Structures are given as structure tokens and as C-alpha cells.
Curated annotation (Swiss-Prot):
Pfam family, one: DUF179
GO cellular component: cytosol
Record protein name field: UPF0301 protein LHK_02881
SUPFAM superfamilies in the record: VC0467-like (SSF143456)
Length: 186
């Protein structure tokens, strides 16, 4: 039997998702295996910018092109902790390698490097992450709570936040307006 692995995929919330935290969410999946799954929501802003976050934790500034970058609500788990999804991988104290070029870092050194204009070329910062116990995500998928598609990092790093949900759906060849909230089982 093939094992489902959704690392480096998007989970796209179905339109009828009732949990307000995950309504219209696009989750970039960082890890999925026997121990469960984890990812970060890439399209729900936290009413905070990267430069203001750096100031709050005692770090000075960021590159001019990073001023005003939104910080995201990454999910309900460890929502008081920062998670940096970035390219390239680099050499940071605490990183989870997702692909040959993408990592999720939780150590302060990556933010310190950003404040000194030496951090990763492309990044988003989230507060918290979305996590699933073993079998929980598979159950939600069987209940048609999520769509899945291989991730396109241009959606993560290049698209305006408001366009990410529809763009992720279009990766499936579906127009968002044609997507209905529930599906049946034969």
C-alpha cells in the first residue's frame, strides 16, 4: 500500500470549512509522516509586519524590500512562537528541511540575520503552525475538508496574500467559483 506524503504540498480548505482559523486557508505542508503532519497557513495575516516583529524582539530593521511584509497566523499550535519558511535553506540552528531549497526554521538566528540584511532571499514568517496527530489529517481528507496539490513556491513568496487561495485552487485546474462546499461519496 502506498503511503500518502503531503510534504511540499498545499492543503486548501474547502469553501464550507467551519473552523474560522482555517476558512479559505492555504496551508504549506512542511512535514507529513507516521508521527503526524505539520504546516503553516500562508494566507491569514496576523496584523503584524516583519519589521515591527523584529522591533518587538529587540532586532533592528530588515531590508527595504522586506519592510511591511506581513506576518501570518501559521496555525493554532505554539502561536506565540515564530516560524520562518524560507529559500534557500541556509545553515540555521533549528531548521526542518522540506525540499532541497525550502526549510522551516524556528531559531532566532535566522531573524537576527534578516535584521542584518543577511537572511534568506525569500521568506515568510508565521506565528504558530497547524499540526495533526497521526491519522487525523487522513481522516479530514476522507471527509473532504481539504483539497491537496503540489506546492508552487511562487504562490508562497510572490503573490499578494489576497490572491493565494484562488491561485492554489487554480493549480488543480479548477476555477474557484466552480468549487462547491461539499461532495458526496459513492
Amino acid at each position: 500500500m502506498d503511503t500518502l506524503c503531503l510534504s511540499h504540498h498545499f492543503l486548501i480548505a474547502m469553501p464550507d470549512m467551519e473552523d474560522s482559523l482555517f476558512a479559505r486557508a492555504v496551508v504549506y505542508m512542511c512535514d507529513h509522516g507516521e508521527q503526524g503532519a505539520m504546516g503553516v497557513i500562508i494566507n491569514h495575516g496576523a496584523d503584524l509586519t516583519l519589521d515591527s516583529l523584529l522591533g518587538q524582539i529587540g532586532l533592528d530593521g530588515c531590508r527595504p524590500d522586506q519592510v511591511g511584509l506581513p506576518v501570518f497566523v501559521g496555525g493554532p499550535v505554539q502561536s506565540d512562537r515564530g516560524f520562518v519558511l524560507h529559500e534557500p535553506i541556509g545553515n540555521w540552528q533549528s531548521s526542518l528541511t522540506v525540499t532541497d531549497n525550502v526549510a522551516l526554521t524556528t531559531s532566532r538566528d535566522v531573524l537576527a540575520a534578516v535584521s542584518h540584511h543577511e537572511g534568506p532571499e525569500r521568506l515568510i514568517v508565521t506565528l504558530g503552525y497547524a499540526g495533526w496527530e497521526p491519522g487525523q489529517l487522513e481522516h479530514e481528507l476522507a471527509q473532504n475538508a481539504w483539497l491537496t496539490v503540489p506546492a508552487d513556491m511562487r504562490i508562497v513568496f510572490d503573490l499578494p496574500v489576497a490572491d493565494r487561495y484562488d491561485a492554489a485552487i487554480r493549480l488543480l485546474g479548477i476555477e474557484p467559483s466552480a468549487l462547491f462546499g461539499s461532495a458526496g461519496h459513492a
